[in-house]
Amino acid sequence: MAASFSVPSMIMEEEGRFEAEVAEVQTWWSSERFKLTRRPYTARDVVALRGHLKQGYASNEMAKKLWRTLKSHQANGTASRTFGALDPVQVTMMAKHLDTIYVSGWQCSSTHTSTNEPGPDLADYPYDTVPNKVEHLFFAQQYHDRKQREARMSMSREERTKTPFVDYLKPIIADGDTGFGGTTATVKLCKLFVERGAAGVHIEDQSSVTKKCGHMAGKVLVAVSEHINRLVAARLQFDVMGTETVLVARTDAVAATLIQSNIDARDHQFILGATNPSLRGKSLSSLLAEGMTVGKNGPALQSIEDQWLGSAGLMTFSEAVVQAIKRMNLNENEKNQRLSEWLTHARYENCLSNEQGRVLAAKLGVTDLFWDWDLPRTREGFYRFQGSVAAAVVRGWAFAQIADIIWMETASPDLNECTQFAEGIKSKTPEVMLAYNLSPSFNWDASGMTDQQMVEFIPRIARLGYCWQFITLAGFHADALVVDTFAKDYARRGMLAYVERIQREERTHGVDTLAHQKWSGANYYDRYLKTVQGGISSTAAMGKGVTEEQFKESWTRPGADGMGEGTSLVVAKSRM
């Protein structure tokens, strides 16, 4: 008789702790925060991926704050409006007026990569580039929050009452591009974002190999299922870390012209095929390969491609079926009935696969249709894709099962597109939040809007559900404009250009960098010195002799021509 096995108490305790943590995760997931989230994994999977040392992340507090902020805007039909911040100066100025912060991959790619090698937004920089910028800004936010607290607690109650409090801890949403590779790359990227301070992350559905800025040509989508895998990887990593990081799913399906594969049936209705039977067996890629073997390149190869595409009769399968029905030798009533039946069943909402479409077409008498989606494939093997708002909506429905916010990248500030997308998304996922890129890549003056319509654009689409809106590169453009115009004037007028354009303007508008020593925290670290040394320090940075005292004094300024009567000015203390 075999001896009975006695489970050691340590094993029982281990299992007990594991099951207790699983129960905690299940309770967490059942909260209001995750009522729309559908995970393809279990709480046991998550806990099994965790270590024994529990860690808390400051970014999680910011994520909860971001969620509250955005849900409040969604409920009120308003929007959190923000823009891409370049540096600590910008992020502290933004804190006085805006309730979220954006970190742009484009700005990082062009101004601040991990290798210091600038370039366009092709997501070819090291994958810690944007997390590093997030940390840069998040550290600055925390520092200025500490600095402000020290300053306020050095004031009397009356002084504090008169001094506006600035919430420097505004949640940061960061650009995760395409996730930077396979599943494990996305997991590690998201881990970095949580550790570095991001409250939210967006991931887009372009191919990571051919990634482009959302307003460049040549964009290649991945299959719906592949992008869902990216989003699941991100959500899983956030769950493993125990954070409520806000996940934004971006789709480039409106302007994309290519897609990596046809593996997902939800993509089928938007893939283009050749309808010219004379091209049977003459694929574009084979013709280009033949041209290259005989030494053709550049314009010659482009000519081959242009001629082939011009003769291919490219269209979607649905469009090809419609054309085939119209060519049938039937009376008009019968044609219209068949067209109506086809168009009803082939609506984009139904996501017919190509196989399902062929079966339905055959029932309607379309049995000899020539339509081939392999013939037009590119040299790289990509399929031709018909981008549209409908394609973006289909993807948005799928992504909304995992992501918290859906963002459709657009080519122009088109209110009709915004409306079509919002109504489409809400027809199946009415509670999901929407985001909109108020892109500086748009020529807003060429949009046809009046100045008043531009003023109304943000609140108008906010009422459609776009509760997070952002100008990706406003920090970059503002920086360039100020420095370019100042440098030009400074070269001509010297110090007067600085005084007129910057110093006096800082004073007029109460910009706290006027007293830049104070802004940088010299007083704050003087407090450290004095605390360490018993309340006094002969080496305090803001002690006697600091030139910043000049900004607290009265002085007489000569007239504009240097000869007239002086004007007595009292400079107010700069804001914190």
UniProtKB/Swiss-Prot annotation:
One Gene Ontology term from the biological process aspect of the record: glyoxylate cycle
This enzyme catalyses: D-threo-isocitrate = glyoxylate + succinate
Active site: residue positions? 213 (proton acceptor)
Q: Where in the cell is it found?
A: Glyoxysome
| Domain of life, per lineage | Eukaryota
Per the UniProt record, which EC number(s) apply here?
4.1.3.1
Q: Pfam families attached here?
A: ICL (PF00463)
What are the entry keywords? Glyoxylate bypass, Glyoxysome, Lyase, Magnesium, Metal-binding, Peroxisome, Tricarboxylic acid cycle
**Which pathway is this protein assigned to?**
Carbohydrate metabolism; glyoxylate cycle; (S)-malate from isocitrate: step 1/2
Do the record's keywords include Magnesium? yes
Establish whether keyword Ribosomal protein is in the entry: no
Deleted gene: phenotype? No visible phenotype under normal growth conditions, but mutant seedlings fail to establish into plantlets with true leaves under low light or short day conditions.
Q: Where is this motif: Microbody targeting signal?
A: 574-576
**Which cofactors are named for this entry?**
Mg(2+)
What the record says about family reads: Belongs to the isocitrate lyase/PEP mutase superfamily. Isocitrate lyase family.
Q: Name it.
A: Isocitrate lyase
